[in-house]
Regions:
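Active-site mouth loops of central-metabolism enzymes
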Residues: 7-22, 76-84, 171-181, 288-297
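Conserved, mostly hydrophobic/aromatic
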Residues: 31, 35, 43, 62, ...
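An alpha-helical appendage that flanks or caps ligand/catalytic pockets
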Residues: 125-164, 206-314
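Short, acidic/polar
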Residues: 18-30, 181-188, 299-306
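Internal, glycine-rich beta/alpha segment that forms the wall or movable "lid"
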Residues: 1, 82-195, 206-213, 217-230
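N-terminal beta1-alpha1-beta2 module of alpha/beta enzyme domains
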Residues: 1-71, 175
């Protein structure tokens, strides 16, 4: 089982953005020190829900500050990025980190980002498959041209090429690409391309198991080898808060997370003025406490093991900054690595 952290760079009420980003960086450094497998970085624009606007840039910093841990984006928002530019960045990080970078991509939401960065609502509603396929071609082929509805350009060479990684085998020829999936449509899209899924922390085990089953069915129907389908490295996002008593862990989150959630979710603005109902912050926090490893080390290990058994997923990206406090976050990460991980081996 491969357990990592999910870093949103969440700005809690009363905190500055520099303070928030410092906590995000420190949580990743402590994750490596504590023996965790990976760090997954979120990306948001114009909202305190998360103050990292470029997951791939923060990934570059963390890859430079660490030696062993895998660093991934969860996710880079594809509709507001040029697939070739993102592909070049991914290839660069893949080569310079010795293959420790994973590129998670997703559609994002119908937010004002689409206006600011220029692609418009159509890129969000219809353009994701074209962007994803162009990105994959850039990471896998020596020369690429664009002939799609959104991206059209003459053939150019891929520089640098991911398959020129030093000391790598065939499995290292391309950085891992993973797709955030929230619907049967996105599951089918990922499965047809043989790409593993990132499944959100709002989903319970039953929903995730259904999505994994659908992915397997669609991947096999698309002609992917059964052994590749069986070995797909899907990632389950969740929340982790470790304490000596379950009530103490839950109390920490229920007391502190709703303030961040309300401030962050309320700040989202749709590009076309459509109404988007946001979750009740307290109810959502309580839901997360019930779904994920929130409690004692034994309870946390049991929850992770149960999720893995029910869904077949063995990789986890766990939000560890739910207290909003630097020292508490560092302690939470250390306990996850030193007290929970040993119970899973």
């Amino acid at each position: 089982m491969r357990v990592g952290t999910f870093v949103l760079a969440a700005q809690f009420p009363g905190q500055g953005q520099g303070e928030t980003l410092h906590r995000a960086v420190r949580s990743a450094e402590v994750a490596e020190e504590s023996g965790l497998d990976s760090v997954w970085l979120a990306e948001h624009h114009f909202v305190p829900y998360g103050v990292c606007p470029s997951a791939v840039t923060l990934a570059a910093l963390l890859l430079g500050r660490t030696q062993r841990i895998r660093v991934g984006t969860a996710v880079s928002v594809l509709p507001t990025a040029h697939p070739v530019a993102l592909g070049e960045q991914a290839a660069l990080l893949h080569l310079t980190s010795g293959g420790r970078f994973s590129l998670g991509v997703g559609r994002g939401g119908p937010w004002v980002d689409l206006e600011v960065f220029g692609p418009g609502l159509k890129a969000y509603e219809q353009g994701f498959p074209e962007s994803l396929d162009l990105l994959l071609r850039w990471l896998r082929e020596p020369r690429v041209s664009g002939a799609g509805e959104r991206f059209s350009f003459r053939e150019v060479p891929v520089v640098p090429r991911p398959d020129e990684i030093l000391d790598g085998g065939p499995e290292d020829a391309c950085p891992e690409v993973i797709v955030a999936c929230t619907s049967p449509r996105s599951v089918k899209l990922a499965a047809e391309r043989g790409l593993p899924m990132l499944l959100g922390m709002h989903c319970g085990d039953e929903d995730k198991a259904e999505m994994v089953a659908l992915w397997r069915k669609q991947a096999l129907a698309a002609g992917h080898a059964p052994e590749k389908v069986a070995a797909a490295g899907h990632v389950s996002a969740g929340v982790a808060q470790i304490a000596d008593r379950r009530a103490e862990a839950a109390e920490t989150l229920v007391k502190l997370m709703p303030g961040w959630l309300k401030q962050g979710l309320d700040a989202h603005v749709t590009v076309d003025g459509r109404h988007r109902a946001m979750r009740d912050p307290v109810a959502y926090t309580e839901l997360l406490c019930g779904l994920h490893p929130v409690g004692t080390p034994r309870l946390a290990a049991d929850r992770l093991a149960a999720t893995s058994e029910r869904t077949g997923i063995t990789r986890f990206a766990l939000l560890v900054e739910g207290s909003g406090d630097l020292s508490a976050t560092e302690e939470n990460v250390r306990r996850l690595g030193t007290e929970v991980l040993p119970l899973l081996t």
